[in-house]
Amino acid sequence: MYSDERSHYENFSLPVPYLPSFVRTGVIQEDSFDGCDYLVVTGCSSNHLVVTINMMLSVVLTNRDASFVLVDFGLKDSDYAYLASELRFIHSIHNALNSSAGVYYRRFAFSNFPEWWDISDKRIRGGYSWKVAAIYDLLLETKRIVVWSDGGNILPRNMGTELQHVYDFGAFSPASGDTIQKWVHGASQSFLHHNKMVRRIMRGKGMCNGAFIAFDYNNENAMNNVVFPFVQCAYTRMCISPLKTSRKNHRQDQAILSVLMHSAKVEKSCIGGHDTDVLIHNDCKGVSCGLLREFVVTSINQKYRVSIPLSPDC
């Protein structure tokens, strides 16, 4: 199941009738990297759509040629008209900037995965295993750098520092605060240790931030010692979300990522002082979302010296 991506998504290669025709489906095409050597992926269910739109706008801000993938983890029928309008707006910005970026959409097929992957379970949110699967699929497809950014994040004008860490060390995730001892449940630690999935569990080390993760497919250490065991763990409940764990005593995907990154000795990650210019978790509602959106579009106008309207209605 790990690599059978066609079973991971509904109607994987088929056009989506309720989205604009420029929105691509299926395998990522090579021309999506004509102007940018990495791919950004994000995803959301209905309750995070607005903040995810803001994040996708910020992809244009950080690099006009950066292609991105939106993974639908549970949008409602009533969401698609709004999504289509916003994707048209982003497409209009791409056109104004003569961008080579591609816009991709895929809908996650939860019915083909274990029941405990259920994103609506507020206790564990399926261990966020669906996120790990989406990242891994794109690493296998593209064989390039894949950047996961949560909806609610705002990417900066320049991601040079973050990307340089990926070029140098094969992976990057900023620090999130507190330690492995506090946020990685003992049952997960035991599973990783007894199954020899890590070299060592460094309990005093800091936690990585699962809201922003980047991997380079062509880095052997990152793939062998972080990505592959991360995926294996994501498919194993005893590893990523043991019984009696919840988000109150365990950090699911972020917990496992933290243990693996430190065990693999990935430099410049998950350590205070080697932080990021990415604005993490700018979750918002109502007026505050609109103001954040205006900030991103205004920043696009300033960076590229264009005059994009602040919204599709302007």
Task: Cite the ranges covered by each PLM segment.
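Juxtamembrane luminal stem/stalk of type II transmembrane Golgi/ER carbohydrate-processing enzymes
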Residues: 1-38, 284-314
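A conserved hydrophobic helix/loop-capping motif in glycosyltransferases and polysaccharide synthases
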Residues: 39-46
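A structural signal for well-ordered alpha-helical segments within the folded catalytic domains
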Residues: 50-53, 129-133, 251-259
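Active-site-proximal specificity loops/subdomain of glycosyltransferases
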Residues: 76-141
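GT-A fold catalytic core of metal-dependent nucleotide-sugar glycosyltransferases
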Residues: 130-186
